[in-house]
Swiss-Prot record:
Cofactor(s) needed by this chain: Zn(2+)
Keywords, sorted A to Z: Cell membrane, Membrane, Metal-binding, Transport, Zinc
Pfam family, one: DabA
Name of the protein: Probable inorganic carbon transporter subunit DabA
Length: 901
């Protein structure tokens, strides 16, 4: 029992290095470093470079591209370098420092000739002898890397590659989502026991190795303990050793981690995986591990050689000149080169990039308010740099935005406003909202796309239930979609007919004899389909939709809003009346919509349409767990239209006029159209007028939004018909980039719409409505930070990781991806499960960057004390800021910006 507790504790702690990965069909953005945020971004970057040779700073090409495009101000970087040098004093000649800085800041690599120079070896040996004890302690973490990493096989590759191939084979077999005709025997017992049963007959192992497998314990914890003991790993090093194995295939390990969270019977899945992996490593390594030295001297020597070579190259100091100094002077030089290494400068370039964006964002807001002030002929806008030394990046805005609490203009909707449309905070909504507001008397609002409803949806046209809320929160309720019994029976029969056709096709494909006949039967049809889809993608897609509407038309449905008893459900079905009131009130507060209602209020979720795209879920709503958010929008709109709910809201101080009607729609981000999901049968005269006005304006809005969006896609030539071109992108089965998704996301603004209204934020900003004056206890802000802002940060860091380290955190080229086991994609037929974004999602071309890899900038419109209170109440968020996993800026009641560094 003691062994089991110890091993389970080790694995529980080691899981911090990977992240749970959902299947690609419900792809949800994940922060790959969420479990590591107790350390600073810089420390994690150093650790990953040491243990996996993964660099998570933007490389030289990305930095140069940012400078060329005006996204990175070199003067900001130079000032950061100057400030850093002022903080340190080095007792070496200044001209060496100047030369070193001028060269290393270009991020050019040290030529191999410098590393191989004999004098470099002499200096390294000299320093190693003097610092052996200290350096051995510094490099202790190298000792506990997997043994298979240190042993090279006959083909010249680490044995860990053979271990990986074995684990890919077995993990694919276990995790298969019922795509294969035969499932893994005994998988219902556990992954480990199924492997034990099958591996005894696997002739990729030798006869002696299979005998070892037969004698393994039935307990995976005991197996892990046995292998670690065999390799003479000290107990204090267990976690580091296990972490090395989890990081070897973080995709497959992450998928198993996800499944262990979803199913109680698979809660020890990572333990099974590690037991199998360690056994495979032991079988392949054998006694060779004894030749792997635990002495750190060779690695310390290599570190000294690299540092000496860097010093000589960047400072233009010949190595023989360095040798003319005594050992203490040489140590001073080495200390300088070590503390001013290339990764320090990569970090400074990244910070300068982020500071440049922060400055540009403030300038946009400043210019927007100057324009508004001039147009309205109101009091002069005083824009001046803040001379407070403690706030070096502040700017003062005294305009219509910097008003006192008694000014009611910010709390009242304009008398001519016909409709208020609440969009998801998704960055793709920002341009669409801007064009809607410019098209007529419409007001837009930002809120997370799940609309504050912690639900699991059970839709009639979806095979599986889906958790329609942020992935870090478990659902608390189940909402079922249903229709009249007759309509449902007809629809189910149609579904079964379609399913039978696909199942028959699959059955023929997966069986020996029928598969020989299948090409003859299906070849002509599939060939014709391929030709038509290639030549006329938009028309073929439209025809397919018409056929689907005719033969598989979804009936008019209702939702189980009221609480129902269902003994088969593990979650409450529907809401009580008080819960409906509470969720409606919470959502309206999060939208900052508790008064001055327009006649027509639209709750707009969003969805994306693309064809032949395994990563389609990555373009859906991140706040709904990688699915469209129209379901949540419809549910909340129906709740808000209920008389008993409105009466309950009235008792809470929120009065919705009888003439105000709530409706639901979906913003299709790939075509910038608004599709109605739910419109009540009866509309008031004012609501009907608003509904018609919005529909009339939508064609122009779509054309303008599509033109703006398509101009950013690497299309060929000028787009003359943006709406048709957008539809072609969404319909073309060969299109690798139907839309940019959330690429270039950079900031999250929490504040009143007046702060950013009319300002072109280039589709880079998440926008969430918030009025600190109505949030007396700070709970609303804490909710926004803990939910929507966290989702945005995860999205931001996934795009960041997929850009700076695509080989490790991305998913490669779409054209060479292989969908495997129904859960994800690989490159080829035996790679790690590629769990990030594809190359085409972040790059405009092979050598042309599109996404800007900078950490999310959160902007809060509130006084300093509100932000300070947030830090006190939300230690998790405070840690993210202090450890540099995101940046924070606020704008207070005087209109003064402050960077919280």
């Amino acid at each position: 029992m003691t062994t089991q507790l110890n091993i389970n504790s080790v694995i529980e702690n080691a899981k911090r290095v990977i992240t749970p990965l959902s299947p690609i069909s419900i792809f949800a953005a994940r922060n790959p470093w969420e479990g590591l945020e107790a350390d600073t971004f810089e420390d994690v970057a150093k650790w990953l470079r040491d243990v996996r040779d993964v660099d998570i700073f933007p490389n030289k090409a990305l930095i140069e591209s940012a400078v060329a495009r005006g996204e990175l101000d070199e003067s900001v970087f130079n000032q950061l370098v100057t400030d850093m040098l002022l903080e340190h004093h080095y007792n070496i000649p200044q001209h060496y420092i100047n030369l070193y800085i001028d060269n290393i800041k270009t991020l050019k690599d040290v030529p191999a000739s410098y590393m191989n120079h004999s004098n470099v070896d002499v200096v390294a040996d000299l320093l190693l002898e003097k610092s052996k004890r200290d350096m051995a302690e510094s490099y202790h973490h190298y000792d506990v890397r997997p043994m298979s990493d240190a042993i090279i096989d006959e083909q010249g590759e680490p044995l860990s590659e053979q271990v990986n191939r074995q684990m890919i084979k077995w993990t694919k077999l276990y995790i298969d989502q019922f795509l294969s005709s035969w499932t893994m025997p005994k998988r219902e017992q556990s992954f480990y026991h199924a492997w034990l049963h099958l591996a005894q007959h696997d002739h990729s192992f030798t006869k002696a190795q299979r005998q070892v497998i037969k004698g393994l314990p039935n307990d995976p914890e005991m197996t892990i303990e046995s292998v670690l003991t065999y390799f003479s790993i000290d107990q204090e090093d267990y976690q580091a050793y296990v972490e090395g194995h989890l990081l070897a295939l973080p995709g497959w390990a992450g998928m198993l981690y996800y499944r262990s969270q979803q199913h109680h019977f698979e809660q020890h899945l990572l333990t099974d995986y590690l037991a199998i992996r360690l056994v495979v490593e032991q079988l392949l390594v054998g006694d060779e591990f004894k030749s792997v030295t635990k002495d750190c001297e060779s690695r310390s020597e290599n570190w000294f050689k690299q540092t000496v070579a860097s010093l000589c190259y960047y400072s233009d100091m010949p190595s023989d000149v360095l040798l003319q100094h005594d050992v203490n002077e040489i140590q001073t030089f080495i200390h300088f080169a070590a503390t001013m290494n290339k990764n320090v400068f990569k970090n400074l370039w990244l910070i300068a990039w982020e500071m440049t964006y922060e400055s540009q964002l403030k300038q946009k807001i400043k210019a927007g308010h100057e324009s508004v002030a001039g147009a309205l002929d109101v009091n002069q806008v005083n824009v001046s740099e803040n001379d407070n030394a403690n706030q070096p990046h502040s700017v003062l805005l005294n305009d219509t935005q910097a008003v006192d609490e008694n000014n009611s203009e910010l709390n009242q909707v304009g008398t001519s406003t016909k409709a208020q449309i609440a969009f998801c905070i998704d960055v793709r909504s920002e341009p669409f909202r801007r064009h809607i507001e410019a098209a007529g008397p419409f007001e837009t609002i930002g809120i997370a796309g799940f609309f504050g409803l912690p639900i699991q949806k059970d839709a009639v046209d979806e095979q599986f239930k889906h958790d329609s809320l942020p992935v870090m929160v478990p659902p608390a309720y189940r909402i079922k979609e249903f229709a009249d019994r007759y309509d449902m029976n007809v629809y189910r029969q149609q579904q079964q007919t379609m399913s039978s056709m696909f199942y028959t096709f699959k059955l023929m494909k997966n069986n020996v004899m029928p598969s020989l006949l299948l090409p003859e039967l299906s070849g002509p049809f599939l060939s014709l389909s391929t030709i038509v889809n290639s030549i006329m993608p938009r028309k073929s897609r439209a025809s397919l939709q018409k056929i689907k509407q005719k033969w598989l038309k979804k009936p008019e449905t209702k939702l189980t809003i009221d609480r129902e008893f269902d003994r088969t459900s593990d979650l409450p079905v529907g809401f009580t009346e008080q819960e409906q009131i509470d969720f409606a009130l919470q959502a309206l507060k999060l939208m900052d919509l508790t008064e001055a209602f327009a006649p027509f209020v639209v709750l707009a979720g969003h969805a994306s349409h693309s064809h032949n795209n395994p990563h389609h879920a990555s373009l859906e709503c991140g706040a709904c767990g990688g699915a469209s958010s129209g379901f949540n929008a419809k549910l909340l709109a129906m709740i808000c239209n209920r008389p008993n709910v409105r009466q309950g809201l009235k008792q809470s101080g929120v009065y919705i006029p009888e003439t105000t009607v709530f409706a639901a729609a979906e913003h299709h981000t790939s075509t910038d159209t608004l599709a109605w999901v739910y419109v009540p049968d009866t509309l008031s005269a004012l609501a009907l007028d608003a509904y018609e006005s919005l529909n009339d304006a939508m064609p122009m809005i779509s054309e303008q939004a599509n033109r703006e969006r398509l101009d950013k896609l690497p299309t060929i030539g000028r787009v003359n018909h943006p709406v048709e071109e957008a539809q072609r992108f969404a319909s073309d089965w060969s299109e690798v980039r139907p839309e940019w998704g959330l690429a270039k996301n950079a900031s999250f603004i929490i504040g009143r719409r007046q702060l950013t209204k009319g300002i072109d934020l280039e589709g880079r900003t998440f926008l969430h409505n918030y009025d600190w004056r109505k949030d007396k206890d700070g709970k609303l802000l804490n909710t926004i930070i803990s939910g929507p802002a966290l989702v945005a940060q995860w999205i931001n860091l996934q795009y960041y990781a997929s850009t700076v380290a695509p080989h490790f955190y991305g998913s490669g080229n779409k054209a060479t991806q292989t969908v495997t086991s129904g859960v994800g994609v690989m490159q080829g037929n035996a790679s790690d499960l590629m769990y990030g974004l594809s190359w085409q999602s972040v790059m405009a071309a092979d050598r042309t960057m599109y996404h800007s890899p900078i950490r999310l900038l959160v902007v809060i419109q509130a006084p300093d004390y509100v932000v300070a209170r947030l830090f006190a109440n939300n230690e998790h968020f405070a840690r993210k800021v202090s450890n540099h996993w995101l940046r924070l800026m606020s704008v207070n009641e005087e209109g003064r910006f402050k960077s919280w560094i």
